[in-house]
C-alpha cells in the first residue's frame, strides 16, 4: 500500500491558485456583488471581509449535448407496451417539460446563489480597482508613493502558480550531485577494481562476488536519493514596492450647517470615509486637510471632522477662503498636487453662491489638479448647484455629482475617481 506525505511548507494555501483563478474569472459578478453589499454595511467595517453571492446561472459550466432536432436511430429497452421493431414517436418539445412546446411542471425547483467569503485585502482591492487620483502630475518625487508589484528573486515558499521549474530543477541537480558525489566516486573505483579482477589470472571468484555486491548496494543508495524534494522547490517572489510619485494633498470640505440633517451628514461622512480608505489603500503618503464649515470654517483633525456636533448657519465661501489660505501657506501648487472634495446639501445664503463661483474660478481651480463637489439632497437644486454647473462647463478639472440615497454613494465615488490618463 502506498503512502503520500504532504511535506509542503505552504500546504494550508494549496488551493490558493484555484481561488485566484476563480476571482479573476468571475471578477465582474464579484464586483457587482461588492457594490451591492457596500450599501448594506458600514464602509469602515472591513476587518471581516465580505460574503459575496453569485447567481448560480453565472457559474454554470458550458456543456455539449444533443439537440432536439435531426434524425437519429436509437435502440431502447422493451417493456410491456413495446415489442421488437416498434417505433417510438419523437417527444414534443424535447419531452422534458422545459423550453419548447412541452408543458411546464407544476413544481418549481432551483438552486440558491453561490455564496463565499473574501478576505479584507481582496475586498479592498476589488472595491478600489481602476480608481486613481485624477490628473496626478509626476514631477516632484518626494512623499507620495504608489505601490506596484515587482519581481524580487525567489523564495522557498509560495503557491503552485508561482513555481519556477528551471530554478527548482537546478536545485534538484545540485542536491543530487552533492549527496551522491562520494558514492559515485566509490562506485567508479569498485567498477574499475572489478574490471581488473575479471581480466586477471587466476580468477578470484569470491572477491569478484564481494565487489559486485558492493556495487549493487551503492547503486541502490544512489537510486534512493529522490529526484526532487521540497527542499529544491523555488517560487518566483513578488513584493509591493513604493513607486516614487508626486506629493499630493486632499482637502475635505464638509458642510455641517443646521440645514444638514443627521441622515445627510451620515451620507457625507460615509463618502469621506470611503475616500480616506481609498487614499490610504492606494497611496503611501497623502496629506489630508479636514475643513468643517457653517457660517465659519475651521480646520480640524480627523476625529473632530467625523464626530464633532458643532453646527450653525451656512456660508460656503468661508470654507473656500480657508482652503485658499492653507494652500498659500503650506502647499505650493508648483510642488504639490492639490485635490479637493466638497460635500454639502446645496443650501447656502443666496448672496454667497456667486462669491463661491468667483473664489473657485479665480483662486482655487487654477491651482488644483481636481475638485469634486457632491450635493446630498432629495430637494430641488438651489443657487449653489447652478453656479457650480457653470464652473463645470468651463473647467475640465471640476466635477459635480448628486447623491440622493445611501446606495448612490459608491457609484458616485467610482465616477469621480475612475482612472484617467496620467500626465508625465
From Swiss-Prot:
Positions with biased composition (Gly residues): 92-105
Classification via Pfam families: DUF444
Coiled coil: none
Segments for region (Disordered): 84-109
Similarity-based family: Belongs to the UPF0229 family.
PANTHER family tied to this protein: UPF0229 PROTEIN YEAH (PTHR30510:SF2)
Name of the protein: UPF0229 protein YPO2152/y2169/YP_1953
Amino acid at each position: 500500500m502506498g503512502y503520500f506525505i504532504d511535506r509542503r511548507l505552504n500546504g494550508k494555501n494549496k488551493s490558493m491558485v484555484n481561488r485566484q483563478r476563480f476571482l479573476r474569472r468571475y471578477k465582474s459578478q464579484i464586483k457587482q456583488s461588492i457594490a451591492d453589499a457596500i450599501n448594506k454595511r458600514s464602509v469602515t467595517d472591513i476587518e471581516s471581509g465580505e460574503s459575496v453571492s453569485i447567481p448560480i446561472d453565472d457559474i454554470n459550466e458550458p456543456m455539449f449535448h444533443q439537440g432536439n432536432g435531426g434524425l437519429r436511430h436509437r435502440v431502447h429497452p422493451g417493456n410491456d407496451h413495446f415489442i421488437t421493431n416498434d417505433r417510438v414517436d419523437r417527444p414534443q418539445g424535447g419531452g422534458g417539460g422545459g423550453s419548447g412546446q412541452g408543458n411546464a411542471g407544476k413544481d418549481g425547483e432551483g438552486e440558491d446563489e453561490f455564496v463565499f467569503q473574501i478576505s479584507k485585502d481582496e475586498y479592498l482591492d476589488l472595491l478600489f480597482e481602476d480608481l486613481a487620483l485624477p490628473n496626478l502630475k509626476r514631477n516632484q518625487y518626494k512623499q507620495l508613493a504608489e505601490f506596484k508589484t515587482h519581481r524580487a528573486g525567489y523564495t522557498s515558499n509560495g503557491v503552485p502558480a508561482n513555481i519556477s521549474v528551471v530554478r527548482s530543477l537546478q536545485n534538484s541537480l545540485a542536491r543530487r550531485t552533492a549527496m551522491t558525489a562520494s558514492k559515485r566516486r566509490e562506485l567508479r573505483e569498485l567498477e574499475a577494481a572489478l574490471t581488473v579482477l575479471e581480466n586477471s589470472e587466476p580468477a578470484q571468484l569470491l572477491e569478484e562476488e564481494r565487489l559486485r555486491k558492493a556495487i549493487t548496494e551503492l547503486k541502490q543508495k544512489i537510486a534512493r536519493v529522490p529526484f526532487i524534494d521540497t527542499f529544491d522547490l523555488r517560487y518566483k517572489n513578488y513584493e509591493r514596492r513604493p513607486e516614487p510619485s508626486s506629493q499630493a494633498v486632499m482637502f475635505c470640505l464638509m458642510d455641517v450647517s443646521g440645514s444638514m440633517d443627521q441622515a445627510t451628514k451620515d451620507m457625507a461622512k460615509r463618502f469621506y470615509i470611503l475616500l480616506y480608505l481609498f487614499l490610504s489603500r492606494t497611496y503611501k503618503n497623502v496629506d489630508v486637510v479636514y475643513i468643517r464649515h457653517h457660517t465659519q470654517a475651521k480646520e480640524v483633525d480627523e476625529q473632530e471632522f467625523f464626530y464633532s456636533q458643532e453646527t450653525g448657519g451656512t456660508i460656503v465661501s468661508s470654507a473656500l477662503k480657508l482652503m485658499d489660505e492653507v494652500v498659500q501657506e503650506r502647499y505650493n501648487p508648483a510642488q504639490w498636487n492639490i485635490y479637493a472634495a466638497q460635500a454639502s446639501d446645496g443650501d447656502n445664503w443666496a448672496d454667497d453662491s456667486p462669491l463661491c463661483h468667483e473664489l473657485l474660478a479665480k483662486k482655487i481651480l487654477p491651482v488644483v489638479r481636481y475638485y469634486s463637489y457632491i450635493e446630498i439632497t432629495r430637494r430641488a437644486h438651489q443657487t449653489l448647484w447652478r453656479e457650480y454647473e457653470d464652473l463645470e462647463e468651463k473647467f475640465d478639472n471640476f466635477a459635480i455629482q448628486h447623491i440622493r440615497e445611501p446606495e448612490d454613494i459608491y457609484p458616485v465615488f467610482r465616477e469621480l475617481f475612475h482612472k484617467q490618463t496620467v500626465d508625465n
